[in-house]
């Protein structure tokens, strides 16, 4: 017997978040046709029933994934996504990239791990007071290095292996992240607007990926799923 999908969002919530507004009809990807309800005033309107189903499938997947002890990497570097991506990843104890995708983050993870270790070691030395034994210029140089590394790697601290999944806001913008995840066989959950190619995405959530409220709603639901999965794992280990 197939397990019923969790119903985690209502049509009303989606409407209030503006999730149904796609891109102008002349800027669409024909592969998104199954997810489009109609066109109004030259704008594609997303079929929100498909959004409900897509989010439910993604929620179930993320819950099961985190219940196995896997982690999710939230990715959203466009301005309107940065805050929600960071806050929801932190709230749910997951990882995030919200500034710039560094090429090789997934496909050259050994190098990324070395950079993360360097950042961790420098912060440890600073917190231990080791910098006090250096000249002012040397200490300032290392502080600047910490700031620089944090700018890129703050959301990846503690990530010692590849994530079990990536959650992407706007796969068109995050094309490199999509390519790397596909290459590494990492499942992709994504908010997919009418101008995107849904083919590389394992869990398509058809949705306006430009509206801040819509982004926050979706990131929040994926974070809730991760929290639920983590809670299940903790309960099973008691």
UniProtKB/Swiss-Prot annotation:
Belongs to the universal ribosomal protein uS2 family. One of its GO terms (cellular component) is cytosolic small ribosomal subunit. One of its GO terms (biological process) is translation. PROSITE patterns: RIBOSOMAL_S2_1, RIBOSOMAL_S2_2. This is Small ribosomal subunit protein uS2. One of its GO terms (molecular function) is structural constituent of ribosome. Keywords: Ribonucleoprotein, Ribosomal protein. Pfam families: Ribosomal_S2 (PF00318). It comes from Chloroflexus aurantiacus (strain ATCC 29366 / DSM 635 / J-10-fl). It comes from the Bacteria. SUPFAM superfamilies: Ribosomal protein S2. The keyword DNA-binding does not apply.
